[in-house]
Each structure stands twice: as structure tokens, then as C-alpha cells.
């Protein structure tokens, strides 16, 4: 550039600052990028209280079903009246909600002979003695004690007001001569220690029955007849925790006289508080 002097214009040069300014801008952008990355990692590594990391959702409550064990016998003239009471209760609540078992046993039970089908069993007699049954018909609802059939409706109504601390799912299959499958126990409320009991019952058995009028009906249709205890008379110990599922496998042989399409598996969990939940499922053909 030219600067005026008294001797005339004087040519001078000035060094440009452009490269330095560009370097400063680049360093500034780089520094901002590094700071941003540091802030991002800082935010990601922020400590979160354990209680705020995952929100636990309690399993939904399910309704409780009721187990009604009817200590009955083919030579019991009042037992058909008790069976009719069960029919009325199941019509009101359904047979899947009020699950009945006809426990043929005791002095009025009948083991059968060469000509006549008997439905009493050794296991049934053992349960009869275990519960100290005094007369027939007499029932045990949810393993809470004995009761007369005239009281069953009221007891069932009260038991159905409860919720179950666990859910039971049954997978039962049959090849015609035996049954097998699995039981899934899902904990819903607290930790549960108890016994899992598995029974096989049979519907629609035509056999002798003494009637209230003193006659003998040889074509009486017996329902939910106890056949066998799959896993022992007392069942097996289980421990089910809330939010977890426990699975138990089972297998059992069928007697030649049983009709597979009429068979049901009943599964229930009980402890000193009685039956906590009960379910039933038909055996499905493989």
C-alpha cells in the first residue's frame, strides 16, 4: 500500500492475519466438540437410584376357585341329595370355578364285585380316616374342615370372595393308556410354601347307587369320581415366589376301565391356610 511522505508516496507491505484467524476458529470448534462429548458421557454415567431404575409391577390378582370334596358312597341313601346340591352350586358358579370331587369311601363306599362296578378306593378310605369323617354325605371345602351339604352353598360363596396368591396352568395329555404333562405355578402375591396335589377324576360313570327312597338305581350317572392321587396322598412340596413361575412335570397310568375322554386332572396348592388355588383340565389326546 502507499503511505504519503514529504518525499512522495512510499510503498509498504502488511502481513495478512487470515491463516492465524482460521486456526483459532478451528481450535475453538474442536474445543467445543470435546466439551460437548464430555458433557454427553457425563450425562450417560449419571448415577440413578436403584428404586428408580426399574419400576416393579405386581402381577394382577386372579379370582380364587373352590375345591369341594364330597365324601360319598354308593350305599349312602342321602348322597344323591348332596350330589344334587353340588349340581346347583356348579350351575350358579360353573364347574371350573367350584371344582368337585366325589370321594367314594368309608363304610358306605362299595369296592365292587364280579357283577357290579364299585367306585370306592383305598386312597379314598385313607382320606376318609385322615379327615375323621363322621357320616356320609359330608364334605371338606378348601381343606378348611368338615361340613354338612346343607352348608356348602354358603361356604362356597364366602370362599369365592377371596383372591388367589398364585395361578395354576395345566397341560395334560393322554395316549389312551396313560396321562402326562406339566403344571405351571405362577406366584402372584408373596412367597408361598405348600403342597401341590394332583388328582385324576372321572365323569359319566354308570354304576349302582342307593337312592333316598330306599331303591337301588343300577344306572345312576356318577360325576367327578376320584380315581387316583398322581403324586402321593399328601402331594409334593413346592415353593413359589411372587413374579416367578415354577413348573412340575407329571405322569400317571390309567386303569383299563377308565374312559380317557371322561378324565380330568385336578391340581391344587394347599398349606395350613387351606387350599390356595385349584384348577382342572381335561386330558387331551396326543
Residue ranges and their predicted role:
Residues 11, 83-86, 122-125:
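Short alpha-helical segments and helix-capping/turn motifs at coil-helix boundaries
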Residues 45-49, 82-83, 212-214:
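Short N-terminal helix-initiation segments at or just after the protein's N-terminus
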Amino acid at each position: 500500500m502507499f503511505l504519503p511522505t514529504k518525499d512522495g508516496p512510499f510503498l509498504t507491505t502488511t502481513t495478512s492475519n487470515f491463516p492465524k484467524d482460521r486456526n483459532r476458529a478451528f481450535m475453538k470448534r474442536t474445543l467445543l466438540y470435546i466439551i460437548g462429548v464430555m458433557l454427553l458421557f457425563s450425562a450417560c454415567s449419571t448415577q440413578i437410584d436403584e428404586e428408580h431404575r426399574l419400576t416393579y409391577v405386581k402381577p394382577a390378582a386372579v379370582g380364587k376357585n373352590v375345591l369341594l370334596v364330597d365324601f360319598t358312597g354308593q350305599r349312602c341313601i342321602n348322597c344323591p341329595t348332596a350330589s344334587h346340591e353340588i349340581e346347583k352350586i356348579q350351575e350358579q358358579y360353573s364347574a371350573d370355578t367350584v371344582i368337585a370331587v366325589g370321594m367314594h369311601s368309608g363304610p358306605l363306599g362299595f369296592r365292587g364285585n364280579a357283577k357290579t362296578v364299585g367306585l370306592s378306593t383305598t386312597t379314598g378310605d385313607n382320606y376318609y380316616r385322615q379327615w375323621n369323617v363322621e357320616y356320609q354325605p359330608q364334605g371338606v371345602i378348601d381343606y378348611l374342615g368338615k361340613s354338612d351339604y346343607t352348608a356348602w352353598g354358603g361356604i362356597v360363596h364366602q370362599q369365592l370372595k377371596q383372591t388367589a396368591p398364585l395361578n395354576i396352568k395345566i397341560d395334560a395329555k393322554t395316549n389312551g393308556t396313560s396321562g402326562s404333562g406339566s403344571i405351571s405355578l405362577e406366584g402372584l402375591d408373596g412367597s408361598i410354601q405348600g403342597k401341590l396335589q394332583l388328582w385324576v377324576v372321572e365323569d359319566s360313570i354308570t354304576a349302582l347307587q342307593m337312592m333316598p327312597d330306599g331303591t337301588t338305581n343300577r344306572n345312576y350317572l356318577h360325576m367327578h369320581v376320584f380315581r387316583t392321587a398322581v403324586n402321593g396322598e399328601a402331594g409334593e412340596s413346592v415353593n413359589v415366589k411372587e413374579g416367578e413361575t415354577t413348573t412340575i412335570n407329571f405322569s400317571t397310568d390309567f386303569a383299563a376301565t377308565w374312559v380317557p375322554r371322561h378324565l380330568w386332572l385336578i391340581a391344587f396348592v394347599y398349606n395350613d391356610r387351606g387350599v390356595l388355588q385349584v384348577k382342572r383340565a381335561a386330558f387331551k389326546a396326543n
